[in-house]
A protein has these predicted regions:
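His/acidic metal-ligating clusters that form di-metal
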Residues: 1-104
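Binuclear metal-dependent phosphoesterase catalytic core
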Residues: 97-157
């Protein structure tokens, strides 16, 4: 990792921590982080999860050793902040643009999902539609999401 990356990554992690601190001090019911990057949560999954969800059907084995990525420090900080916050946390991103709403963040100690964390990956090119976020502070999860199809962009199959 070069100096530019290290500086940018430190700024990203500091910004995220400040955001969680502000949300905690202000009594926020939830927090939503919106970014372009897909931080590749799958790279941090326990081997049993990789086998079950990603590789088993292909007859492949998960890697014996995991390679470090540029997102490792960010994801570790995201885990710590999410657990400490204890309320709904949503990470919205594009990048790979495969529409999904899931629970991809696992505890590094428990190796189980962190229940108050949700990822929303927006749909994108060539399938140009959008995702509606519904915010209701009275609901326990605060956020819900719905894919909205743009009729003019619908494909004739």
């Amino acid at each position: 990792m070069d100096a530019e990356y290290l500086e940018r990554n430190a700024a990203n992690v500091a910004w995220m921590r400040q955001s969680f601190d502000l949300a905690t001090r202000s009594g926020s019911r939830a927090i939503m982080i919106v970014a372009q990057a897909d931080p590749r949560f799958e790279n941090t999954w326990p081997a049993y999860v990789q086998q079950r969800y990603m590789l088993e059907g292909l007859g492949l084995k998960s890697p014996e050793t995991r390679r470090a990525t540029g997102f490792d420090e960010f994801l570790a900080a995201l885990e710590r902040e999410t657990v400490a916050f204890g309320k709904p946390v949503v990470y919205v991103h594009g990048d790979t643009h495969i529409f999904r709403v899931d629970k991809p963040l696992f505890g590094s100690t428990s190796r189980r999902i962190i229940e108050n964390f949700t990822r929303v990956e927006t749909i994108g090119y060539p399938d140009t539609h959008w995702v509606r976020a519904i915010v209701d502070p009275k609901e326990p999860n605060v956020f819900s999401f719905r894919l909205e199809i743009v009729e003019a962009n619908r494909v004739k199959h």
